Amino acid sequence: MQLRHHLILTGAAAGLIAAGPATAQSVDVSITVPRLTVAEYHKPYVAVYLEATGAPARTLSIWYDVAKAKDEGRKWLNEVRGWWRASGRTGSYIADGSSGATRAPGVQKISVNAARLGGLKPGQYTLVIEAAREVGGREVVRLPFTWPLKPGQTIQAAGKTELGAVSATFKP
C-alpha cells in the first residue's frame, strides 16, 4: 500500500519557499577506514565534528567501543585528542545520540540531519574527522567550507594512514 502526502502552502509561506535560495539541510559523510596490515589490528575510534572560530565544537558522531563492560570503552576516548580537547571531555556526546560502535575497515557512511545542523550561522567552518587506534596511529582530516552550501555540493580530502578518502555531500 502506497501513501501519498501533499502539503499546500499559500500566502506568505509559499512566497518564502519560492523566493528563498536552496541551501543544504543535511549532510552525508563518507569515511574510508583502511585495512592496515599490522600484527595487532584494532578498529579505530573516530570522531566527526564541526569547528568554527569562536564557537564550541559540535560533535556529529563518535565511534568507540560502546559494548565494553562497565563502559570501559569511554576510558580511551581521550586518545582522540583534538576532539577530546574541543568537546569530548564535556561528556554531552553520549546523551545526544551521536555515539556508536567502532567500525570495520571499508567505506562507512553517516547522515547528519537538519536538526543536528540547525542554527549554523553563515560563515567559515571545518568538518573534522579524527581517528585514533590502539597500538596504532592517529590522524586528522580537515574539510573546510563556507556555510551555507548549495545542495549537491561535495567537499573531499584524504588521509594517509588511519583514514582514507573522506567526503561530505550536502543535501536539500
Predicted regions located by residue number:
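Structured domain cores in non-transmembrane regions
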Residues: G54-L120
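Bacterial N-terminal signal peptides that target proteins for export
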Residues: M1-T10
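Beta-strand signatures of extracellular beta-sandwich domains
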Residues: A47-Y49, S61, V128
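Sec/Tat signal peptide C-region and signal peptidase I cleavage site
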Residues: G20-A24
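Short amphipathic, basic-aromatic surface patches that mediate peripheral association
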Residues: V29-Y41, Y64-A67
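Structural beta-strand segments of beta-rich domains
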Residues: Q25-V29, P44-V46
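Short coil-to-beta strand junction motifs in C2/discoidin
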Residues: E40-A47, Q124
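Glycine-rich, aromatic-bearing surface loops/beta-hairpins
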Residues: P105-V107, A115-P172
